[in-house]
From Swiss-Prot:
GO cellular component: cytoplasm
Taxonomic source organism: Shewanella denitrificans (strain OS217 / ATCC BAA-1090 / DSM 15013)
Gene name tied to this protein: queF
Family: Belongs to the GTP cyclohydrolase I family. QueF type 2 subfamily.
Any one GO BP annotation for this protein: tRNA modification
Enzyme Commission number(s) from the entry: 1.7.1.13
Upper taxonomic lineage: Bacteria, Pseudomonadati, Pseudomonadota, Gammaproteobacteria, Alteromonadales
Official protein name in the record: NADPH-dependent 7-cyano-7-deazaguanine reductase
Amino acid sequence: MTHNHDPYSDAQALKGLTLGQATQYQAEYDPSLLQGVPRKLNRDAIELTTELPFHGTDIWTGYELSWLNGKGKPVVAILQVHLDIHSVNLIESKSFKLYLNSLNQTRFNNLDAVKDTLTTDLSQCAQGEVTVKIIEPKHFTIERISELPGNCIDDLDIEIFDYQFNPEYLLDSTEEKNVAETLTSNLLKSNCLITSQPDWGSVMIRYQGPKIDREKLLRYLISFRQHNEFHEQCVERIFMDLKQYCHCAKLTVYARYTRRGGLDINPFRSDFEQAPDSHRLARQ
């Protein structure tokens, strides 16, 4: 598997994105603001075919959802969106933010009308299955802060000199003994593919198979620090690298990124379990 070729340098699908461009904000409903990015761009580079070796979802949380009710009174809510990974496109985050802003001065008669509109528009942009949940203020208390389950590997006392992405940190990183364990790190950091702005995240790796050397795993995760790719693409890359180099029999990779523009993205990929309930982390 090659990781050196840049699949994005000549990608026409990235040329017209509003991301990284000066933008005028629209306050009235405009679904054309949504922009999709083909998942195929990254999946070709890591040799993923239409028969994906995992299932999963991209879990979005929107903290700045607002519209007007039938009488023109503002309403606020928290948005949760689950986007199935078999969709043709992922949703570009700045366009998602601009689209949500376009609801701010738009009247809806009830909550179902908002939900139906969001479901239709996001599904059309992604060309795939989307599930929308709208959390009203009276239910905000269920949005508790939690931690990713597992053993955090961040306290390992290692010295780092190289911050370039390098999957070969995982070479010869396993023992003969088979284990079932869950490891976490809060040190995941990559950069936006278009703007190079930092993306901060926490990641959970749950696997069954040969025991992975935790120091080598941490070095690998830290090597994303100057890597330019979207959140969803980074998680799929981690999944494929762990499968290739560590020979995991069962594997889940779940990352929760800090929010930008009122939105956070939390990609979940697994070949043996379903996505957990979405609970924000302290940094979100």
